[in-house]
């Protein structure tokens, strides 16, 4: 069960020194697919099914996911064989690593489907958005007692568990004597689409003492450039790091 998944994982906060400075690192790769997104995608399906029972009279959810690699596998693993859900993952045929492609195409589960598309991640995401907003498709689902949902970070259920681990990490620092309650910390997040660092911002609004949010980026630096300049530059850069590979 879900509880067993988390019980057998080590505490995510680790301590390290870099250039003589102490860092406190959240190890978020202890989930079943070794992606940090497991932290949210292992519990999101259960949030969703509870919500369906309360608000949609038992409808089934069809989950659409666009992925550049790691989200797809983590979402498939999270939703596999979860009652009242079906999941379809779309990925760019030449835009994921051979390992990720193998992981997705060999995914077990009676409710999972994987589709390769021509184009890049943005093409996959645009296609998913088009499906979401096509009335005829939504009407067909409604007629079959189904509705669409997403496992991408546009879904609040993805952000909620991430807020929790920032607060948990702060409490761990206090308990370990690294900081005193109320001390402010800096949060550094390697980010591709701002979802993870946005969760830390929401945690700060809820009262977590954060001094700075540092958005770390590679050559796909649209977010750091946007924060510095206010200009959102649309360009496509292919990189090898899946969690920060975006057609931007």
Locate each region found by the language model:
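N-terminal entrance/gating region of PLP-dependent enzymes' catalytic architecture
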Residues: 1-34
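Short, small-residue-biased leader/transition segments that mark boundaries at the very start
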Residues: 2-6, 241-243, 248
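Well-ordered mid-protein domain cores that form the structural environment of catalytic cofactors
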Residues: 24-81
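A glycine- and small-aliphatic-rich helix-loop capping segment at beta-alpha/alpha-beta transitions
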Residues: 42-53, 78-88, 104-108, 204-210, ...
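Short glycine/serine/threonine-rich phosphate/pyrophosphate-binding segments
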Residues: 64-77, 97-99, 193-200
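Active-site/ligand-binding loops adjacent to catalytic centers
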Residues: 101-154, 158, 163, 219-236, ...
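Domain-scale recognition of functional cores that engage charged ligands
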Residues: 126-130, 135-204, 208
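A conserved active-site cap/scaffold subdomain adjacent to cofactor or substrate pockets
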Residues: 185, 189-236, 240, 244-246
């Amino acid at each position: 069960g879900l509880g067993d998944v988390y019980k057998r994982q080590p505490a995510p906060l680790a301590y390290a020194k870099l250039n003589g400075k102490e860092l406190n690192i959240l190890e978020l790769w202890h989930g079943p697919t070794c992606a940090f997104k497991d932290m949210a995608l292992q519990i999101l399906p259960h949030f969703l099914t509870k919500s369906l029972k309360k608000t949609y009279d038992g409808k089934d959810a069809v989950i659409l996911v666009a992925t550049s690699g790691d989200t797809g596998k983590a979402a498939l693993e999270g939703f596999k064989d979860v009652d009242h859900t079906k999941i379809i993952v779309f990925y760019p045929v030449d835009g994921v690593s051979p390992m990720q492609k193998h992981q997705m195409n060999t995914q077990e589960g009676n409710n999972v489907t994987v589709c390769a598309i021509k184009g890049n991640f943005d093409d996959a995401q645009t296609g998913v958005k088009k499906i979401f907003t096509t009335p005829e498709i939504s009407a067909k689902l409604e007629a079959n007692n189904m509705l669409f949902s997403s496992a991408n970070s546009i879904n609040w259920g993805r952000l909620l568990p991430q807020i929790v681990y920032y607060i948990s990490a702060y409490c761990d620092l206090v308990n370990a004597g690294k900081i005193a309650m109320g001390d402010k910390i800096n949060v550094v997040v390697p980010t591709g689409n701002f979802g993870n660092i946005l969760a830390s911002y929401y945690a700060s609004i809820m009262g977590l003492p954060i001094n700075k949010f540092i958005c770390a980026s590679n050559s796909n630096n649209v977010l750091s450039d946007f924060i510095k300049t206010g200009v959102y530059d649309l360009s496509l850069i292919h990189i090898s790091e899946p969690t920060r590979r975006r057609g931007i």
